[in-house]
Structures are given as structure tokens and as C-alpha cells.
């Protein structure tokens, strides 16, 4: 379990610090439990302002990984091959966008045709607000909204003219949740999806530890970076879940060699195209 999974509750209610610490200890994550026990609290709850500030620092550090892995360029390269034909507007939706680094990078380089609208969606309102502020300050043609991207009417209005992407999201889902993740996109009838996540292997785990020790300063970032690599789903699990959840899509995981991997391949995409 990653510490960031516990910093905010789905309901928006304050998080009881002692409960978060106890949960981590029950899972044998004593180091993570100690890290959480040192976070600021008010009346037994994690201090909301301090937690939000920590979340922003963590995601700013996470952008370093996106820059190193050239995610903006790589996502744009794949999305260009998935865009529906015709000159009508197409919407590219980044689910779990965080600070919107991927879309902001694409917008800054104008790597997709003018008919493409870039929209980032995240459940965390603090991250969405900061993503919107950054886009505005950088003068970028992309926007960010808070909510569940797969709820009808939130952001996907015309599935046939929509491509859904994400980066580093799927490992936050339990194996039993993956079917529903893909099924939600199929129900909306999206033209295609491309979800980047960690390819689990010895090299990715070792690389995550080295990178986060060298480039990250927050204890939470260092812990969660390695945990992300350890909990990532193998290609077989993703393919099976996508096949069950989105049977009308042609699915593939574009994965390099595990024994002679390229550094950029540590995050590889699962791509689905509606038949």
C-alpha cells in the first residue's frame, strides 16, 4: 500500500492519523507507518492544509519522473495513431491527471492536431486547481476538471470522438477492480484508450529505488515510488481484465524485453481500440 492512498479519504472526511498508522502496521509496513505517524495532525486527524501542501510537493517531484521518461512526447506519439478519422473535434481525456504534466507537455509542444481538445480529470480538487493554475500561467491550451471521468456527463460527452489516457494509474487499482475500470470506458463507447503503467520486473523495482533516492526529497515520495513498482500488474493480468471488461476492443500491451529493457520502457502502454 502506498502512503498517498491514505492521505485523503474518498468521502472527503478528515483522515484519522492513528487509523492510517494502524492499517500500515497491520500490513507489515512499519517504515511507512512511522512516516505517517510524524505527519502534522489536529485533534487526531491529519492536518488538511499540511496534507494538501505535502500532496502538491509529492506530485511536483513526480513530474521529474514524467520528464525523465518523456511521457508527454510518448503519449502524444501513441495518441496520434488512435485519433478517430475526420476533422470533427476529438477530446483526449487524461484520467487521474494529477498536476497535468502529460497534457501540459503535449500542449506546450503542440504535438497533436488543432482539432484535439486536452482535458485532465482527477478526483483530488487540490491537484486539479494547481494543474489549472499552471496551465494558465504557462498559457497552454488545455483544461482540468475535478470528478469521476467515467461518470456520464462529467467529461466524456461523445465517446466515439474521445481517447482516454492515463499514466501511473492502474497500479493503484486492485486486480479485482481492473475489469470495472475497462468496462466503464467500454460503456461510454470511447474510440480508444492508452494507459501507461510500470512493467513489473527486477529492473523496474531497482530503478525505482535508485531514481527516487537520487531525485526525490519527500519521505513519502521515496516510499511510494518503490511500492508502485512492487504492486504494478503484469501484462497478463491487464490483458485478461481488459478482455473481460472491454471485449469489443482490440487490446495489446506494448512491452519491451524484460531482460534487456530500455529505460523508457519502465512505463509501457496498454492500448485498446474499438473494433
Label every PLM stretch briefly.
Residues 1-48:
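N-terminal auxiliary segments of SAM/dcSAM-dependent transferases
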Residues 45-48, 52-78, 82-83:
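Class I SAM-dependent methyltransferase Rossmann-like catalytic core
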Residues 93, 99-151:
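Class I SAM-dependent methyltransferase SAM/SAH-binding core
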Residues 151-158:
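Short conserved loop adjoining the S-adenosyl-L-methionine
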Residues 165:
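A conserved beta-strand element that flanks and buttresses the S-adenosyl-L-methionine
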Residues 173-185:
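A short, conserved alpha-helix within the catalytic core of class I
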Residues 189-199:
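Conserved beta-strand signature within the Rossmann-like core of class I S-adenosyl-L-methionine
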Residues 198-246:
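C-terminal alpha-helical "lid/dimerization" subdomain adjacent to the S-adenosyl-L-methionine
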